[in-house]
Amino acid sequence: MKKLKVWLPSLFAIVMIVGMIIGFRLRGNIRSNGFLKARKSSTVEEVLDLVNNYYVDSVSTDTLGDNAIQGMLSHLDPHSSYIPAVDMAEMNEDLQGNFEGIGIEFQIFDDTVNVMNVLADGPSDKAGLKVGDKFIKVGKSVVAGNGISNDKIRGMLRGPGASKVTVTLLRVGEHGEPRQVTISRGTIPLPSVDVAYMVNKETGYIRINRFSETTHAEFAQAVMKLQQEGMQRMILDLRENGGGVLQESIEIADDFLDDDKLIVYTVGVHSPRVDYRCKRDGLFEKGKLVLLTDEGTASASEVLTGALQDWERATIIGRRTFGKGLVQQPFELTDGSSLHLTIARYYTPTGRSIQKPYDNSGHNDYNEEVMKRFHDGEVLHGDTSSHHAGLAYQTLGPEKRTVYGGGGITPDIFVGFDTSTLSHSITLLYINGTLNRFIYTWYVQHLPAFRTFKGPADFDAGFRDQDKVYDALTRYALKDSIDLRSVPAADKITLEHRLKGLLARQIWRTEGFFEVTNNYDPAFAKALEVVSQ
């Protein structure tokens, strides 16, 4: 438990997904015609005017107004939120599933912008950029050695489609003058399906990281591809999926459920009940199905999980889901900002609400509830649903299993959190960015060896340098005052597996990472066992 407390801040910085605040988008944006408008000035407006005209120091009334809105929303539910105009573009990119840019992943370390990955057939790939390139300038702006931020670089590299940006760079192995490369920006996909591959001759695996406007199309393409390869059983991984566009999760549920089965319904004080039912023949209505969930599975992911559990269509494996059963509708405000207001609750086919309890007077307890599961040991030992459960319901299939509302979705089969990476030294590898820097450096230095592997499975089976890589990491980590020499044996093994997965990610991105790390994942192993029975 002591190790848990040390590791928790890092865990939640990585695990909890920004998609949770996106909520559900039931309709298109609705423009606000009267928000905070009245024939007579409101008290809030009067106070802002008085501060602006008479306050002793200079202040930003825009900032005060934003804070006033945030204060107002803090007395509602935990998921009603105000999104300033400056943050809307990034949020819309997540929902749309693409953005305009040059198609690279980069990381700043040693005060240098390093190209970590280049999107195949993307703008940078076509312009000749390579992994290992180091940017000196973007346009006329020097970006090396001046403490520039990731956000600043991202803003320089993104821009309207077909517009051009010139980068000046140094290339590994070249000792002449820096290169200048001009790149035409293009549409860069943000895939919501991380990976889809055949585990064996009959079992396919698909992982969805969020629900964007392109998710169902991505999912359908993945399913049809795997079916052509012989898929008869499926493992669907929704771990760490914080939700997104509700309609996309409904479409995927329709691929698993037959007839006109109810998938979910929503209702609120000012929102009449709306039922969402199956409308078409699904892509995978008959094959055996297992879902993987954890405490990061939330919102639209819980809609899908709840529907499949209620109809006994899938076996749920993993840990209790987050417990977000509130529907947000975005209202576009006149300045380009957006109010995401909770307008309804969603209910699974049995009628249960998955929303966990909250107090309108403050959200601290609500925000810390998942962390409390770690401190209480629930994620290690499972739970009986007794301390968080609401009303009991019976599933709608022949087994008539008992399920509960009011606190997320409890899996049918529990698999605890793997604590083998919770030692203090390993935690520091993540917090300090040491692990990412090492992986990049090692990969760039050994590129010819990695190019001999045909794919992730070949790499996992044929890579024999784990000990060599671990020893190199041990020496590298000492530069950041991290000592791995006394790490417990079990933690060392887990770290070696993670190193292999991260190296695979350098070559094949998320497809490589999950295809390798799944082979060492207890929850995945359990899912494969159950789906094969």
Kindly give the residue locations of the regions a language model identified.
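Hydrophobic membrane-insertion alpha-helices, especially the h-region
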Residues: 8-25
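Cleft-lining beta-strand/loop regions that shape enzyme active-site pockets
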Residues: 25-40, 44, 48-56, 60-61, ...
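Extended, small/polar residue-biased N-terminal targeting/export presequences
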Residues: 55-116, 162-195, 517-528, 533
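Conserved functional hotspot residues or short segments at active or partner-binding sites
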Residues: 353-354, 358-533
